[in-house]
């Protein structure tokens, strides 16, 4: 049987080393490395239904096709990454919730906002505890549309994709031991920054590839509706 005296000693060690653990965990998060970082190209094993995207003739149809394509793609290789110093972080599930569109600041393009939500498991170094966290953030991608002077057809230029730092949140699921709460609270900013960067690096190329497969006339129609004030913020 586990002796009370041993339990007291263990608790004392945990409490006494809490500041050290915070520092070590902070270092681990700062040194987070992706196990298999993706290349610039979209992985071929995602099995994206490009034909479904190309068949869309209007933005509502295209939006539904994009959501279906992204949420049914095999993202297995994008869900695991590890770090140095014993920190392991794994994305358990990830879902694209919606697409929101508004005119760009210059009025000549579209800013697409893509809300994401998911859950991850974090293995704390040195104490071997696994905790679950929920993550939500927004990706923003800009699009500009111009008419080709020779063909008279619309052409789409896909601009920068980034995460909205004002819309990132991480929540701890099933808090238990105070020492674990203290450790995670102490590195919440580091975790937020790391997760947003990793998800942005993984998902932005995929999002931009999907947008590039759409018929330009679909996005031209969306822009025309935005200019006419006929489209709500959430599409």
Swiss-Prot record:
Keyword NADP carried by entry: no
A Gene Ontology term for the protein's cellular component: extracellular space
One example GO MF annotation: lipid binding
Signal peptide positions on this chain: 1-20
Main location: secreted
Tissues expressing this chain: Predominates in the parotid glands, present in smaller amounts (1/10) in the submaxillary glands and in the sublingual glands, and at lower amount in the pancreas but undetectable in the liver. Found also in lacrimal gland.
GO biological process terms on file: defense response to bacterium
Compartment(s) of residence: Secreted
Keyword field contains Signal: yes
Disulfide bond positions: 161-204
One matching Pfam family: LBP_BPI_CETP
Assigned keywords, A-Z: Antibiotic, Antimicrobial, Disulfide bond, Secreted, Signal
Coiled-coil ranges (or none): none
InterPro entries xrefs: Bactericidal_perm-incr_a/b_dom (IPR017943), BPI_fold-antibacterial (IPR052507), Lipid-bd_serum_glycop_N (IPR017942)
Family: Belongs to the BPI/LBP/Plunc superfamily. Plunc family.
Function in brief: Has strong antibacterial activity against P.aeruginosa.
Record's protein name: BPI fold-containing family A member 2
Source organism per UniProt: Mus musculus
Gene: Bpifa2
